Amino acid sequence: MNVDPLLRRVETTAVSRQLSERRLEAEERKLATGTSTSFFVFQAQRDLAQARNNELLAVIDYRRSIVDLDTVQEAPLR
């Protein structure tokens, strides 16, 4: 069982979340200066929520795979 792809998914989704956070911060700054609208801020908030959800799901999948791997490695041979 190879967990490396799942670890890469965790790393990738973490980067995506960070970029979504930056985008939201930028939209909020633009809104404060009058160069954006609440619609674009809402979109950035929605995208950040989705990115956080994707990251959480990736972490859960990775941790489950680690538990499964440990279980398989500790199982007695027949």
Task: List PLM regions with ranges.
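Amphipathic alpha-helical coiled-coil segments
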Residues: 1-54, 61-72
